[in-house]
Amino acid sequence: MDKQAERGQSAGPVKTPQGTQPPAHNYTYHTNAAQRAVYDYLKNVKPIPELAEPKTYKTYEEASVEAVLYPIIEKHQVIMVAGAFFGDEGKGKTVNAVANHPGCTFIARVNSGENAGHTVYDDAGRKFVFNLAPSGLLSKGKRNYVGPECVMDPISFMENEVKQLIEANVPYKEQLFIGNVSIVTPYHKLLDLLASAPNSSTLKGMAPIHASKVTKRGIRLDHIFNDQSVLRSRLRKDIDTYFGFLKVKGLSDADVLRRCEKENGDGVVRVPPYVVEFVQAEDKVEYLVKLYMDRVRNNKNFPARCDVAHELRSALSRGEKVMLEGPQSYWLSNAREKFWESTTSADTTASGLLATAQYNFQLYSSVVINVHKAPGSSRVGVGANPSSFVAQDYFSATGVKTLRDLPENMCVDFDSIQKLFFTKAFHPETKEYNGIWEPLEFEDSTGKYNIGVAMAVASSRQHGECGAVTKKPRVCGFFDCVLQYEVNAVQGPYLSISALDRGDDYDKLGVTIAYVYYNGKNDEVLNINGREYKNGDIIKAGEAVPGEVALYYCHPIVKLINGWKQTPIAASKRKPGDPLPRGVCEFLSTVEYFTKAKIISIGNGPRGKDIIYIKQ
């Protein structure tokens, strides 16, 4: 085990800072000596008094959407629904609830691109997977817009999103309008594929297209609908980046084609056929011009175009309410320096939505509804994730692209795994309980597994935690109050927690209330924003969140909450109006205490109507 591999969290595979990762991570399924050594240090950390907080728990009661959500909407002209963690929080349900308010008539996506993925259901129970299309398309009488600061691959948009609407007979021609978006071309997606670490990107071309955008190269949608000579000229200028990359890397078209075939080799189409055709095309610019003429400009099914920012301002001036549907999340925003190396390429905070919506925020009142998910708070891709069951890049580093890459029967007994984890790995019965978990072993017919690995795999299986875009298993973990506190301080207080009915499956739940810093080296000190971080330092909710280079070495201090297995809250098992179980009230009280958020709703099932509004 090399020194790099000794830098790990107490129960999962080790964490290594981005940019300094060695070729071999030495991740294992079983508990290794390095993890035991980390635990031997962390188990002696002095307990923090906050583990005994809150002293009392609030009582929460169910109320109607009209009593809880609608008064918030009615006080404001612009309602933003924003992710509060690392994306995939289940925002669609809250988006639908806001969209269904009678006064909310204008619904828009105003930034980012098809790397966002959300699953929504219409009133008939039909499932739709949208990336750029606003969820309001499934609500009657709503106008839906994709704003000009979004980035769009129009071929993918038509094939994967508009096609769903056509097949379901959704009258999108009267409901969906597209602004002068920046165009994601096949070479942007190929640059993403060729330049990204394995399994670290959605392969949707986000970083390359935003690079084209900020350097004032590339094309926008209007270029496709106007003079073809201008379109050709701009494409020739922008594509130089792609050709230059191939030259520097010594790659031929044949090399790129083999890479595409390898990426699609497991049956999941990550590189679409038209991108492969682009690689094979002799004259790539002419291929693109013809592609866009045939499948965008001359396509009668392409949605109507308009000046979205002007339409939005006009709607506000008429007294209409506007909903901005946030992609990704606060901590995935490229405008947040704490995680900037491992984020998306747009500002996906609420302030980023406000800026790209292009309205006068001095004239119109706005409000943010943040959405988090628990249990099973998750992240995809690479980067730090202090509250995760395993290192954030565990699946990527071990070559797991989808759950099919794991042994079929590996860690399928979720109940036994969660029971071992929450009732044996923690030791709350001891006087010196400090919120650190012990790296126990779980064994099934396929082998022995570190309990963190077992929880990560079992959670992904049990909760269906795979990317809506990539199908990659998400890395799950505890609800993180340290990170949520900052989200609340910047764009709170309203918080909706989705998927809380998952708690029906747990004996206990964990909430991260602080971190302890430990890098495995006694004399190594990190200086982040003027503060020095050394082994044993505690970072509590409400304190400054350190940069990602320090967060790789942060380990969660976990407060345990009693579960509610005997009184499930899932919509299929609970009658509306039934009292909320004590465990649910303990969980909500703990989150509110440590984050200062105000919880307005919890999700309790897959359907849009499966949501419990909270009266306090």
Swiss-Prot record:
Stretches of Polar residues bias are at 17-27
In this chain, substrate is annotated as bound at 468-474
Binding site residues for IMP: 88-91, 115-118, 202, 216, 328, 343, 472
Q: In which pathway is this protein known to take part?
A: Purine metabolism; AMP biosynthesis via de novo pathway; AMP from IMP: step 1/2
Recorded hits in HAMAP family, A to Z, give: Adenylosucc_synth
What the entry lists under PANTHER family is as follows:
ADENYLOSUCCINATE SYNTHETASE
What residue intervals traverse the membrane? none
- Chain positions recorded as Mg(2+) binding sites: 88, 117
Residues holding GTP? 87-93, 117-119, 474, 603-605
- Task performed by this protein: Plays an important role in the salvage pathway for purine nucleotide biosynthesis. Catalyzes the first committed step in the biosynthesis of AMP from IMP.
Q: Which domain of life is it from?
A: Eukaryota
EC number(s) of the enzyme? 6.3.4.4
Cofactor(s) this protein cannot do without: Mg(2+)
State the protein's name: Adenylosuccinate synthetase 1
Q: Which family does it belong to?
A: Belongs to the adenylosuccinate synthetase family.
User: What organism is the protein native to?
Assistant: Trypanosoma cruzi (strain CL Brener)
Instruction: Give the reaction(s) catalysed.
Output: IMP + L-aspartate + GTP = N(6)-(1,2-dicarboxyethyl)-AMP + GDP + phosphate + 2 H(+)
One GO molecular-function entry: GTP binding
Q: Which PROSITE patterns match?
A: ADENYLOSUCCIN_SYN_1
Region of interest (Disordered), residue spans: 1-27
Listed under GO biological process in this entry are: 'de novo' AMP biosynthetic process; IMP metabolic process
Q: Which residues catalyse the reaction?
A: 88 (proton acceptor), 118 (proton donor)
Q: Name one GO cellular component term.
A: cytoplasm
| One Pfam family, short name | Adenylsucc_synt
Predominant location:
cytoplasm
Q: Please, what other remarks does the record include?
A: Parasitic protozoa lack the de novo purine biosynthesis pathway and rely exclusively on the salvage pathway for their purine nucleotide requirements.
